[in-house]
Amino acid sequence: MYAILDIETTGGNYDEEGITEIAIYRYNGTKVIDQFSSLINPLKEIQPFVVKLTGINSKMLQTAPKFFEVAKRIVEITEDCVLVAHNAKFDYRILQTEFRRLGFSFERKTICTVKLSQALLPEQPYFSL
């Protein structure tokens, strides 16, 4: 079982930043069997380069749920799954950081599509989305 995820954050330093958006698709190897997506109010400012990159700004997040309000759903949809993400190391670390801030651990195996792309398509000049 896989949980394919994408996360947007307030900046590039996972231990200082917060999540602003998350999307997760639970995939059983044949089809998507569950999904969850939400903006998240990180309770901190978004760095200007991130606003420019993602289009997500603080005003959009004012009424969004806080991480603690969606944490249970994230645990449920990723339970018994391998997390799949582009640059999985960053997304996984910021998820772990957010759960640690709540006093909980979050442990999952990961697959990084950047590393897979580099292995399968070594001739490509770059691997960003």
List where the protein language model places each region.
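Conserved non-catalytic scaffold segment of RNase H-like nuclease domains
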Residues: 1-108, 122-128
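Histidine/lysine/aspartate-rich catalytic loop segments that bind and position anionic ligands
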Residues: 109-120
